[in-house]
Amino acid sequence: DRSVSRGLGDVYKRQVLGIIKRPDNTFLITQRVLTKAWAPGHWEVSGGACQAGETSFQAVCREVLEETGVDVSHADGGFEFSYRRDNPEEKDNYFVDIYKFNMDITEADIHLQTEETAGFRFATAEEIKAIADRGEFLHYDSIRKVFE
């Protein structure tokens, strides 16, 4: 089950985000398709919800592979930290497990899931911060320490 109950009927979902860092200190970021209902065209790192029976690590490996074509299951790196988001009004409460993988990948290794992702780039931490400063990078305040 991908939901975690916590007191007074609050339900929290488990989400995952997977960051890929290259030896040149750039990170793989992807751009959401313009047809997304929420935050179309915004930049992000790969991720999504855990499915029933899936561990957090299995979920991040699946999500990164689905969205980018990159298999992180045997990459150096791994779990970094978790954060919690509380939004009881919208019943959108979740925990997010953050993973960072160190991989020497190139543009040729990327095969985007076109239903979800419009584009990608390899960006430095400074470039990602600049995108976030424009309000165009999702979850930046919650995950920024992973880019250090």
Q: What are these regions, as identified by a protein language model?
A:
Residues 1-8, 12:
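Single conserved hydrophobic/aromatic residue that forms the stacking wall/gate
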Residues 17-47:
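A glycine-rich, hydrophobic loop/mini-helix early in the fold
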